[in-house]
């Protein structure tokens, strides 16, 4: 396993995930009867700061259809949590208009690179172009100075 599991932290994430799903109207319990489901949800609401009991609640009451989705969500959250510790693995977001993103994605696919690699290549290309333009401007000025001296 690449990322260490932190039971207390992840228990809080699981609790928040289940509460969010409940507020969105999803059935988070395996109970068919409404009163039993409501009792289980009320128990869950009281367990926010009790990680061990949250896991026990999940084992006893959680809807089995939510299990896989919750595992995926927690795995992604764990990855983001650990990647955020280091500057080089921390993800940043930028706002792009859809058409700009679409053109960037097409270029990345054509070059066989990720979006990030493509952005880096575009920046490097622009820097080389600026350097070349600066050198050409300098050469033109030097040539002009030489020709002016001879006349």
Swiss-Prot record:
Q: Which InterPro entries match?
A: Arc_rbn_hlx_hlx (IPR013321), MatP (IPR009390), MatP_C (IPR035375), MatP_N (IPR035087), MatP_N_sf (IPR038339)
Q: From which residue to which does any coiled coil extend? A: none
One GO biological-process annotation of the entry reads: regulation of DNA-templated transcription
Keywords, ordered alphabetically: Cell cycle, Cell division, Cytoplasm, DNA-binding
| Superkingdom to which the source organism belongs | Bacteria
Q: Which Pfam families match?
A: MatP, MatP_C
**Keyword set includes Cell cycle:** yes
* Keyword Cell division in annotation: yes
Q: Which is one Gene Ontology cellular component term of this protein? A: cytoplasm
Subcellular localization is given as:
Cytoplasm
Q: Where is the signal peptide?
A: none
**GO MF annotation terms:** sequence-specific DNA binding
| Family statement | Belongs to the MatP family.
Summary of the function given for this chain in its UniProt record: Required for spatial organization of the terminus region of the chromosome (Ter macrodomain) during the cell cycle. Prevents early segregation of duplicated Ter macrodomains during cell division. Binds specifically to matS, which is a 13 bp signature motif repeated within the Ter macrodomain.
On subunit structure and binding partners, the annotation says:
Homodimer.
Task: Please state what the protein is called.
Answer: Macrodomain Ter protein
Which source organism does the UniProt entry give? Yersinia pestis
């Amino acid at each position: 396993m690449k990322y260490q599991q932190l039971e207390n932290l992840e228990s809080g994430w699981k609790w928040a995930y289940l509460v969010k799903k409940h507020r969105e109207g999803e059935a988070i319990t395996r109970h068919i009867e409404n009163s039993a489901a409501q009792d289980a949800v009320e128990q869950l609401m009281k367990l926010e700061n009790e990680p061990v009991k949250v896991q026990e609640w999940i084992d006893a009451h959680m809807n089995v259809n939510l299990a896989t989705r919750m595992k995926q969500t927690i795995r992604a959250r764990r990855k983001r949590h650990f990647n955020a510790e280091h500057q080089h693995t921390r993800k940043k977001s930028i706002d792009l208009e859809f058409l700009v993103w679409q053109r960037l994605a097409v270029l990345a696919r054509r070059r066989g690179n990720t979006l990030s690699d493509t952005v880096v290549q575009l920046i490097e290309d622009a820097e080389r172009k600026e350097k070349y333009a600066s050198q050409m401007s300098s050469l033109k000025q030097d040539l002009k100075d030489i020709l002016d001296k001879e006349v």
